[in-house]
């Protein structure tokens, strides 16, 4: 073998090892750039937690100060919210569908509320 070829090969191998070592991540240095972000997020979460506590206390005080008229409105308001949530939910209460004929699907066991008709209708679409 040619000695120059051996030297060139060993030099390339040595450079490859040095470059690989320089590119390796050091665990102590890797987390340094994220420390300010972690501190900032911890401070933000603590501040939000304190704001949430203040808001919860204010809501409790408002409930304590509410008069008898407010107590009567609460169930009606909850019922209104529940009906709105039901309307916004996808129609997934059926346990199956069947194809009657081409392009006509009927639901089996579906009782869907049709707000236009004002009553529940059997699941034929």
Curated annotation (Swiss-Prot):
Please report the propeptide residues according to the UniProt annotation.
26-85
Query: What is an example of a GO molecular function annotated in this UniProt entry?
Result: hormone receptor binding
UniProt-annotated location(s): Secreted
Q: Name one GO biological process term.
A: neuropeptide signaling pathway
Q: Which InterPro entries match?
A: Natr_peptide (IPR000663), Natr_peptide_CS (IPR030480), Natriuretic_peptide (IPR050787), Natriuretic_peptide_brain (IPR002408)
Primary subcellular site in the record, as a coarse category = secreted
Signal peptide limits: 1-25
The record's family statement is: Belongs to the natriuretic peptide family.
Q: Report what the protein is called.
A: Natriuretic peptide GNP1
Q: Which organism is it from?
A: Varanus varius (Lace monitor lizard)
